[in-house]
């Protein structure tokens, strides 16, 4: 009986070593991006990868773009706490900020505030082409073809 238990323990040890080898053979690669690498703040509220492969980062003090090598900060938004990012089209991002909802043109680096009551925009979700749900502290909004409409939930 002791011999069988010893054999089972040896087999179990070999199985566990084999499983550990499988997991250790594919290490996870990651980057740690901080103010040292160019972020204006280490407080990151939103991350979005666009269709071009850029990673957009919404921080406590503005918007940044990471291309895999370097961080670019957009100073036009340096005073805005960005909570949410969605891609509207190949040129435009939709940004949820503490001062409302804004369009950001990637070609011109210009922001335009969308006409909704001033409220902190906490989340934006794309539900179809040119259709978004926007969660604010003042309620929920539905945007269709750039036209916002408040949704009242009962």
Where are these regions (language model features)?
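Carboxylate-rich, polar loop motifs that coordinate divalent cations or form catalytic acidic clusters
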Residues: 1-154
